[in-house]
Amino acid sequence: MADSQNGKSAFFFFFVSLILLFLSPSYSDVTASESDPIPYENSDASPGVVTSSESDRQGVSLHRLEELVRNLTELVARLDAKLSETPFKVKKEITRDEIEEKAKAFSVTKYSPFWSERFEFTSAVKLDSEATCINVLPFRDHEGLSKYFAVGDSSGRVFVFLRNGDVLVEFFTTCDSPITAMVSYMSVYKNESFVVTGHQSGVILLHRLREGSIGEDLNSAVMENVGKFDGTEDGLQVTLLEVHHVGRVRYILATDLSGKLTVFTENRTVYGSVSPTSRPLVFLKQRLLFLTETGAGSLDLRSMKIRESECEGLNHSLARSYVFDASERAKAYGFTSEGEIIHVLLLGDIMNFKCRVRSKKKVQMEEPVALQAIKGYLLIVNQEKVFVYNVSTQHYVRTTGPRLLFPAALEDIRSTFLSHRESTKTTDHQKLEKVTPLIASDREKLLVMGLGDGYVATYKSKLPISKAEFNTMLWSSPVFFFILFLFGAWHFFSKKKESLTAWGPDDPFSSTTMSSSSTTTAQNSSAFSESTRRNDDHMDLRRRYVSPSRYPPGAATGAYRSVGSNDPSSRAPVETTNYRTTAQEMKYRGGSGLDSGGFGKRRESLFGNNKALDDES
């Protein structure tokens, strides 16, 4: 607006000067003389007398000046109109740009609501240096959630934070080299843990972290350096640290940039070292199996020998990073040099194992990346975004691999707890400096993620964990058919046993079968062992005892004789004492009256005429 006003004033000043110049007599004379050069014939004429020719010349000059003034007036009017319209348009454009800028600044916090809806923000911390490594410590609270997490930076320091973001410990590890790997495990004491840090210079250090016990401040902790591991002065960067438990003995496995695998004991001495053909990327806990850039391998601690094999379906591409599933140990997810997300199965033991790629998916993602798994989900972080994948249902895993739920920009995640100005400064700083992707978890719901420029944030997952329903059971599974086979075999043999024992010798209602089986047993008794004969005698002894009847003697006798009336020779008269006995007789029959001397003699038939029945038959 100031430039337009200055232009208008300069133009009017030029216009007024031009009019005054034309109206001046000297300029008019010069103009007239140049336009109509008429010689003075009468040189003697007096200068005060004005001739007709001079008046004509003045009239022509005035007419030209009027035309010039008219043209200039029209030009000024046009310029005024244009100048009056231009500020409105400029102001309108500026207002529109400001509105768009305000809308854009407002939409930064609402650009991707997926992250804030699915992950609950817990805390955020700011380091004055670059974070290079994150590890969730094994301390648990009464709810089973992790209490602390440790962050290593580029100057060799370790920061221990509470889950709510409070700084618990700031500790210098005695090595100013950046921390590139970190692992922790519990001590034999409940309130102590050990933290192992691997540095870019190849140094591996052991530290002890002790939290406040009962009677002390529970939110206080002390960290001290225990010592340095032997044989770590080769200068190669430590890329991987893992702890292996054998009973109460712990071994620390370390891998450097060249792929060399070194095993240390708890007292920081070297147990052994071996160099595989491909660099290990991740270890399967408690099985000494690991995935490499080209396949898989296993380590035998006794002989310190390595077995390696290629991964079926990898097709000679190199894996950059791996992470094992949080629920199923045999599953792993990786990112290859071809920009593919792969789903891998690692089965077997250290002597016989097999690696197979189940699925591949091409993605638009730039390296480097960091992978982390929580229950049912996979998270991949690069320098700009975080990608969340669903791996909870078996259908996705068996057919197309992990399914992408949503991506979220790190800038949008930062804007949820930073102001717009601070977030913009962080973004500009990240454009100049490359961000190291960092992410860690407790394999449950707690997530710790580096957001660049020293910011580290913690989140709690609100994602639903889908459990396999009954109708999703794989009916073609071999385990299911094996269970069916076992059930069928059990049913068949149980029915067969019932059919064989249904009419056995214990049945008192088949006298003919009982008599024939007794005769057969007597004839073939010499062919059986002593134990078999004793078992038969015990069975005969049980059958020899007749239980008292609940019916009166008369009714029992009449009922029995009515049956035997059809065949008088089939049964002998039954005495009533066989059905009703006194207490003394019961005592006599259950006492010494029985022949217990070896059970050598064959017992007599219960009824007297059984032999006659056998003869008649």
UniProtKB/Swiss-Prot annotation:
Basic and acidic residues biased stretches: 531-543
Superkingdom of source: Eukaryota
Subcellular location: Membrane
Topological type in the membrane: Multi-pass membrane protein
Residue span of region Disordered: 34-58, 511-617
Record bears the keyword Transmembrane: yes
Biased composition (Gly residues): 590-599
Annotated GO CC locations: endoplasmic reticulum; membrane; mitochondrion
Listed transmembrane segments: 10-30, 473-493
Polar residues biased stretches: 43-53, 563-584
Residue ranges, compositional bias (Low complexity): 511-529
Coiled coil: 60-86
Keyword Protein biosynthesis assigned: no
Keywords recorded for this protein, A-Z: Coiled coil, Membrane, Transmembrane, Transmembrane helix
PANTHER family the record matches: OS06G0115200 PROTEIN (PTHR35464:SF1)
Name by which UniProt lists this protein: Uncharacterized membrane protein At1g75140
